[in-house]
Amino acid sequence: SSSHMRILSIKNFFRKINNNNIVTISVLTPSVFRKNFDLICSPLHDKDKLKDLKNVLFFEGSLAQVSDLEPDNQIGLIGLGGVNKHFIFHENDLIKQIEYILSLYPKKQWYVFTSRRTPEMMIQKINQLKKIYENISISTEGFDEIIKKASIKIITQDSVNMVYESLSCKGKTILFNMKCKKENKVVKQ
């Protein structure tokens, strides 16, 4: 909210100096002074917050860079979120699904990316898998590069941004089977 206030202050400053109309655009829903923006680009799930405004463009999901790069059939990506309020992050169920994936695609090099929400115990379980499967590695860097190269990307449902980033690249996107805690607008997406 302080950044939105700063932007509007800068707009007023330039308006006084140049005597021109400065256009202000907010990408994502501003928390304050919504009526002062000329245009707001907002996720569809914020529609109720902005129902009184006519200067809003809604988008589905999250903003992600689109890639036309042809995927490499030798590369796969596993994206893990973590504990969240929408889905049950059951580590053992996810490990079983990962083992199944590795058995289906034994020749593919798998890159596992975790998030700051991924429990340490889950990371330890992935490290145990590395002792059995040589074609898996936990990656801390290179996500933007690998997601574009991966021919198949398997992602936990709680990682909404990662899902949309994957859908913005060529290759298959598959979601891990996870149970939702309750039906709401996030799990229905």
Show which residues each predicted segment covers.
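Active-site and donor-binding regions of nucleotide-sugar-utilizing enzymes
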Residues: 1-59, 64
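Short internal beta-strands
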Residues: 40-43, 110-116, 174
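Short, charged/polar "capping" segments at the starts of alpha-helices
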Residues: 7, 33-34, 47-50, 85-88, ...
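Donor nucleotide-activated moiety binding/catalytic core segment of transferases
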Residues: 126-164
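A short helix->loop->beta-strand "cap" motif at the edges of active sites that frequently abuts
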Residues: 18-23, 106-108, 170-172
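Nucleotide-sugar donor-binding patch of glycosyltransferase catalytic domains
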Residues: 167-189
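Active-site donor-nucleotide binding/catalytic segment of nucleotide-sugar enzymes
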Residues: 61-120
